[in-house]
Amino acid sequence: MFARIATLVSAGLVIGMLTPPPATTFADSPKAVAANGIVKVKSAYGMDETIARLKADIAKKGITFFTQIDQDKLAAATNIKIGPSVLLIFGNPALGTQFMTRNQEAGIDWPVRILVYRDATGQVFAEYTDFVWIARRHGIVSDDAPFKMANEVIGSITSSVVK
């Protein structure tokens, strides 16, 4: 009987751990943040124009643009179809590395990335990870100011694709 109870309790704990928390809006984040930390912005433009606008705004802000990865092209080379999907990678090393001084594992989330993709209905989106969520993910809770500032910057960048 105790073994059965232990099994049920263990199963309940595992299910509880696997169940994602509800969507969250961080008090100081400009947009609703999904439970996984993703901020999804609906673009008013097609893929090429969305990418061009984002890259132009990144450059205008003096942020280093590292590269873009055409994920659909990579998938097609292996005979896999995923649809238009481009990952933009950019950042400000002086700021990003400051985040990593608080927890070096936070480097998994830097440089900054925006995923631009077109869904099955033809709608283009730009997605990124909320910086306050990243801070919480890595146990950085002492000072939210730089993360809030980073949210403002990326929010400004993605606003360039919204009418």
Name each model-derived stretch.
Residues 8-21:
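Bacterial N-terminal signal peptides
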Residues 55, 59-112, 116:
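Compact, glycine-rich, soluble single-domain proteins
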Residues 114-139:
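Beta-strand/loop substructures that line and gate deep hydrophobic ligand-binding cavities in soluble
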